[in-house]
Amino acid sequence: MKKKFYTLLLLTLFFTSISIASSDFSIEEVSRDLIVFSQNGQQGLIVINENNSIVVDPMNQETTKNIQNFLASNGKPMISRIIYSHSHWDRISTGKTTLNKDIAVIAQQECSLYLSTNNKDVLGPTIYFQDYFEITDGRKKIDLYYYGPSHGECMIVIHLVEENLLFIPDLLHTKGASFPRDATLPYLRPSTLINFFNELEKLVQKKKIKSFIGGHKEDKLIGSTSIIAEQKIFWELMQKTAEQAEIDGIINLDNFIDLEQLDLQPYQQYDNYDSEDLINIIRRYTSFLNMGR
């Protein structure tokens, strides 16, 4: 894989004003037609076809301009479609003047609650789908799957069929099962999370998918899909711990667990372990068990 870093000083192509691009914009070529771009710690995809390019999660206006400049300066076709992997604005705020008005924007139906009129910088989807959507363009085929609320209400996984590679925007780390990036878990949906992982495992087995790319920049660009089962075990452990803690009476009135009453060894094996994070995660699960939220 080839890695290229671009410090873009003047972006005059396709834009009405001169912009200065951030020096941390980078691309990494997975294959001739599949490129991972990253900026500010987040990652998305560019899928290049003969006559057009498809972008997954263009992040923001600056990143979108960097992508367009990269395509133009390398003789690549310009963007014709955008796929939103979920509704969080830090991944989809392109600005409405940056892109051609004829661009198709694809998102899962549940995203509509957040994308209707809430953010003027988010280009509204032109296509919504429920559980599955297929994009076929020339020899390229991209499958979009929705397995219910997981990281927010509408996160999807994307199967790049030619490469037999998954793009999973959140909930997984390419280096292995881990504590979450944000232990306050503002977007986690415990009621349907395990079902999400179950369905993801079925997809991987059915399609014989061995590798995935995540939505956050990490030391390893590509991870093994065996991590899916390992991460599911982590979340099952969190729920079982919360359930047992309630039975044992070691949860106080504010839903905080007494860690001194807990054997920490099963949790310390996971990357990014932090005792305070463990307390917050268990609190999230006890809140779910007690209130259904």
Where are these regions (language model features)?
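Bacterial N-terminal signal peptides that target proteins for export
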Residues: 1-9
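Bacterial N-terminal signal peptides
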Residues: 8-17
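Boundary at the C-terminal end of the N-terminal hydrophobic targeting segment
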Residues: 19-23
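Metallo-beta-lactamase
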Residues: 24, 28-30, 53, 60, 109-154, 161-162, ...
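Conserved beta-strand hairpin/beta-sheet module of binuclear metal-dependent hydrolase folds
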Residues: 25-69, 157-170
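Active-site HxH/HxHxD metal-binding segment of metal-dependent hydrolases
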Residues: 65, 69-136
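Accessory terminal helices/loops
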Residues: 204-211, 218-293
